[in-house]
Amino acid sequence: MYLEFYGLNEFPFNITPDPRFLYYSPRHREAMDLLLYGIANRKGFIELTGEVGCGKTTTLRSVLSRLPHDVETALVLNPSMDGDQLLRSILKDFGLTIRGNDRLDYVEQLNEFLLMQAERGRNVVIVIDEAQDLGAEVMEQVRLLSNLETDEYKLMQIVLAGQPELRERLAQHDLRQLRQRILIRCHLSPLLEEEVIEYITHRLQVAGAGEGVWFEPEAIKKVYEYSNGIPRLINAVCDLAMLAGYAAQSLNIEESQVDRALQQLECKV
């Protein structure tokens, strides 16, 4: 609705995990570097945590888009499954036609695939998002997958991504063997107030906004107070604030437009 008025090519504050819109705060850049390092150097298990809405999925998609062409990837987005379903999901994401009907068949097929990739000099990555919701039996299956290795290196790298509860899960005594295998850990924290300014500006620029479209300092301050620096909440209020700005025919988003957005979100700061 407001795209033409602001001269935008697309909506700047959608909540879909589009890597093009990823703003690299120091924590996001560090997480990206650690993830890419762990994958390239075949470190086995890698852990990525962050609060809801802090950009974990977007960061993961950005990492996957930056991997070389000789890296095979599988992305598991639904953790609510048992061990057999997890294995089938992984095999399907690798583009394999599933053979057999039980776990031993699935593991054998996955191992054959991994060995074939190793012979070709190709790396393999499995990303499991929302991993804090994995059941105990599935967690154990994930650990067992890491046993698929050669004498020299891990046949696949497994990224476990989730909310801070994932760290609590992995701290449990019965998951100590899995926890001990995680060699790289990174955490995404909310943005600082000065980073919120850069975040909003970055997303506007990616969407095609010119210099005449911007958020007033008091408007940004109120966005930060509402969102506490969580990108998903920033997007929600900024999208509605721009709609309010369009209704007022104002290129600059003022505090009053953010107030209108917060009213629509039924929130009070």
Where in the sequence are the language-model features?
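Walker A/P-loop nucleotide-binding motif
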Residues: 41-62, 79
